[in-house]
Amino acid sequence: MKLSPTVILAFCWLATVTVATAEFEDRSFLWRASSGERSVYLLGSIHFMKADSYPLSPVVENAFEIAETVVFEADLDQLNRAAVLMLAEGTLEGDAILADVVSEELYREVSKRLEAAGMSISNFTKMKPWMLALSLTSFELMRAGYLGGEGVDAHFDARAKNEGKRRDALESVEFQVSLFADLSDEESEEFLRYTLVELDAVIPVVDEIVATWKAGDPTRMEAVSYT
């Protein structure tokens, strides 16, 4: 009796999905690499989506249905731990406040931006610049209806859990947090400055990324992602 094919569905960042020998799957960001009876499906994932984004294309849904193991970028069971780590790493130490670690001009710009959104900078003075930058972007996404809980990875993680599929992760939450926590003070400030400049364009760009992802157009995705 032959063993059933081993099928792994992996969720990766759109910008890093590269499979030189993969077979492109029917106008979607799903690739398949096979060797004999073994198949690996690679799906470019968007981490923030709207609730009405599902179901996805039949080819993606079918890949999930036949998958025995589902591998995600990070362990979504560790989200609470990730939040605790982010808070710990993203908080300024001792008596330091945001005004101490960014320029006066940048501090004023951040304050105006928060006030325009109905918030006070006094609630964010202990955040490191990179943490505040992430928070500002998250606020914009949520206001437009994009939610992490509706992301492609979160969607399929919940389904995999409910259906009893094996689940695994490529990265630890510690590694993901370190990508920001390891920024130098100068890099952290520049990240916040860049975020403020680009903040008004976030939703139009995300709208286009999602539309391009649904259309399965990798050429257009590259243009959108690197402009």
Positions of predicted regions on the chain:
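Prokaryotic Sec-type signal peptides and long signal-anchor helices
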Residues: 15-18, 45
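Bacterial N-terminal signal peptides
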Residues: 8-16
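Boundary at the C-terminal end of the N-terminal hydrophobic targeting segment
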Residues: 20-22
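Bacterial N-terminal signal peptides that target proteins for export
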Residues: 1-8
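Structured, acidic catalytic/metal-binding patches in enzyme active sites
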Residues: 27-226
